[in-house]
Design a protein with these regions (language model features):
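Membrane-proximal bilayer-interacting regions
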Residues: 404-406, 411, 417-438
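Long, highly charged low-complexity segments enriched in Glu/Asp and Lys/Arg with interspersed Ser/Thr
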Residues: 438-469
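Extended, helix-rich architectural segments
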Residues: 2-162, 465-466, 470-482
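Surface-exposed loop-to-helix/strand elements on domain peripheries
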Residues: 112-115, 299-416, 453
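Long amphipathic alpha-helical coiled-coil segments
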Residues: 383-398, 429-446
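Short coil/turn segments at secondary-structure boundaries
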Residues: 137-139, 153, 266-273, 342-348, ...
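Extended, regular secondary-structure scaffolds
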Residues: 136-139, 144, 149-241
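Extended, charged amphipathic alpha-helical segments
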Residues: 220-355
């Protein structure tokens, strides 16, 4: 398998040659079969190797391996502090928490009771398969390197007791996984790089109808893909596969340099050089007097050239350094769309005013525009999962019945949400729709099922209570009189 032992001693722009974002791999073939899969794989690997090198760099950067650690100083090399302010880690964790702090839930479109039970069962199966843990890992990879992959594989039990599904979910390492696309952006085939027991590298590829095992440039095995779709689904961070880290990597490098130099300035001030003017002091005498905390010198050239001893001090202006740091950090937050937790609030601020000023509102919008990209990939996953459940469990759900619900903080404006729920119910809105609209619960479908009897007794449909109006047939009076 690919091994990248290189340390991040160079800036990222030198690794990617200023070609930011991962390259999308395309094929010109109209169809991928056993006849052309080996050639197309070799073409794709040439592009993927560059992507893999960039992904490895960004992953090491996220873990703290940043260029400042390899800085060399020519002037006073003994004073060379290397401080990593790992904003990349904070960035990735905050971006991941925005989406995956609560489990992604599936909600039913409509009010069919049978399908509602199936949706609840689907959410329970996803929970038993530890889907949230898989989602968190996928969102981390998206933020770190710009893309991520989910694999929906066969579950043969693997010794698990009371396994409820015949599939398993896993997050694939994007260094060893990629998807190749047709020119119309439809997936052509996927590739997973693996090693056998002898350490020999081989490639496992899927198309919509077949799977292939390739090693040493030859097709070893192939068969039918029973999923009817490629079980490796890409989860891009955006259309350009830009990672969150590389968007501001120059700023984070500059903050590391600034922080290190500020510590260097303090250390150089504390351990300043001693300057001797018109006097000579041997090494042993100097060391002895320094331990005592005093120096005694005398002039060697009479009164005209008096002897003097001074400490050479030039302190770095920490105030100006803090101004630069604050400016860089503000630019970092603005570009990434993160809220500033350091802002000072006044006593009369409302929650809405605080959210606007501190950037929480903008951060929410950034997350919202990223959700459709995530939902597109999630829809591809749910199609494969529902197809498998239709065969094994007799599910009647279709993808159009399922609404993907990404949960955020449920504690904001709870009083307002409760009031809106009451208003909607009083206006005659169906209780299932009202519960979904207010976004108060992480699993609105389960809440609707548990509250069904109570809701139907309190908010019975008014139309059911009213008697059907009697329709009188028009009578032709002239005919009657005749």
């Amino acid at each position: 398998m690919y091994n990248y032992p290189h340390k991040n001693y160079r800036p990222f722009s030198a690794i990617c040659d200023c070609g930011f974002g991962r390259k999308i791999i395309y094929t010109r073939q109209r169809q991928i079969t056993w006849r052309n899969i080996v050639d197309e794989l070799n073409k794709a690997l040439a592009i993927h190797r560059q992507n893999a090198a960039e992904i490895e760099y960004l992953d090491r950067y996220y873990r703290g391996d940043q260029p400042i650690l390899y800085r060399k100083k020519v002037n006073r090399p003994e004073v060379n502090n290397k401080i990593v302010v790992n904003l990349a880690y904070e960035l990735v964790e905050r971006k991941t928490a925005d989406i995956c702090a609560e489990p992604i839930q599936y909600v039913l479109r409509g009010t069919d009771d049978k399908k509602s039970d199936e949706i609840s069962w689907l959410n329970a199966i996803m929970d038993s398969e530890n889907k949230q843990e898989c989602d968190i890992d996928i969102c981390r990879w998206r933020s770190i390197c710009g893309t991520a992959y989910r694999f929906i594989g066969n579950d043969e039990g693997n010794g698990s007791v009371l396994d409820e599904s015949d599939f398993e979910l896993s997050s694939e390492n994007p260094i060893y996984t990629f998807v190749v696309y047709f020119p119309n952006n439809k997936p052509a085939f996927s590739c997973q790089i693996r090693e056998d027991e002898n350490g020999q590298e081989f490639y496992f590829c899927y198309t919509n109808g077949q799977w292939f095992e390739i090693s040493e440039g030859k097709l070893r095995r192939f068969g039918v893909n029973g999923n009817g779709a490629i079980p490796v689904i890409e989860y891009p961070n955006n259309s350009r596969r830009l990672s969150d880290i590389e968007m501001t990597i120059a700023i984070t490098d500059a903050i590391n340099t600034l922080s290190s130099d500020r510590i260097n300035g303090i250390e150089q001030f504390v351990s300043s050089w001693v300057k001797f003017v018109n006097c000579e002091v041997d090494r042993d005498s100097f060391l002895s007097m320094r331990q005592e905390g005093a120096l005694v010198v005398k002039s060697n050239n009479g009164t005209e050239n008096k002897a003097d001893v001074d400490v050479m001090t030039t302190e770095l202006n920490q105030t100006e350094g803090q101004v630069v740091f604050n400016d860089l950090f503000e630019r970092f937050l603005d570009i990434q769309g993160l809220a500033n937790r350091a802002s000072i609030n006044s006593g009369g601020d409302t929650q809405g005013a605080v959210n606007l000023r501190n950037g929480h509102y903008d951060a929410g919008l950034r997350t919202a525009i990223n959700e459709p990209i995530l939902k597109k990939s999630e829809n591809m996953s749910i199609k494969i999962i529902l197809n498998r459940l239709r065969i094994s469990k007799g599910f009647t759900l279709v993808p159009s019945d399922v609404e993907i619900h990404i949960n955020h903080n449920k504690l904001d404006n709870m009083m307002v949400k409760a009031e809106v729920l009451q208003i909607l119910l009083n206006c005659g809105i169906h209780y299932k729709r009202a519960i979904k609209v207010i976004d108060m619960f992480s699993d609105p479908e389960q809440v609707a099922i548990e509250s069904k009897d109570r809701m139907e007794s309190l908010y019975t449909d008014k139309a059911e209570k009213q008697e059907e109006p009697k329709i009188e047939k028009p009578v032709n009076k002239e005919v009657v009189e005749q």
